[in-house]
Design a protein with these regions (language model features):
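Basic, flexible Lys/Arg- and Gly-enriched helix-loop patches that mediate nucleic-acid binding at interfaces
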Residues: 2-136
């Protein structure tokens, strides 16, 4: 389900165990259930399909947006800036503070995101900071 852009792996597990998934019309609540390309998989009654095309988007995030897929406080979310141009679910790779601006990658390629963001990759990241106030 994560490869279909429905939700993250952890959220997909919750969706499955809560009984919101059907395979060929039968409810499925067991994690690890195998399906084939011929099976009809639905979440909340809507059929889902595997995302075949990998998408990589570089966004110049403006200040005032949260780097998250949703925000319980109702704040503006950076991924919303992409919704008009892209229909698939895109995830941010890393994050920037709400009040900072800068480049951030969004993708539907979970393996790519993990290679960039997991500490074991030991990738060096460089940040350039401009402050509107003098630093102490």
């Amino acid at each position: 389900m994560a490869r279909c852009g429905v939700a993250s792996r952890r959220a997909s597990e919750e969706i499955i165990t809560s009984g919101r998934v059907t395979v060929n019309g039968a409810s499925v609540t067991e994690l690890g259930t195998k399906v084939s390309e011929k099976d009809c998989v639905c979440v909340d009654g809507k059929q889902i399909f595997i995302e075949e095309k990998k998408r990589y988007v570089l966004l110049n995030k403006p200040s005032g947006y949260v780097c998250s897929l949703s925000d319980e406080k109702g704040r503006a979310v950076a991924s919303d800036l992409l919704k008009e141009a892209y229909t698939e679910r895109l995830y941010n790779v890393g994050r920037l503070d709400m009040f900072s601006s800068g480049l951030i990658i969004f993708t539907n390629d979970g393996e790519f995101a993990a290679r960039l963001s997991h500490p074991s990759a030991e990738l060096e990241k460089e940040y350039i900071v401009d402050s509107s106030s003098p630093l102490p």
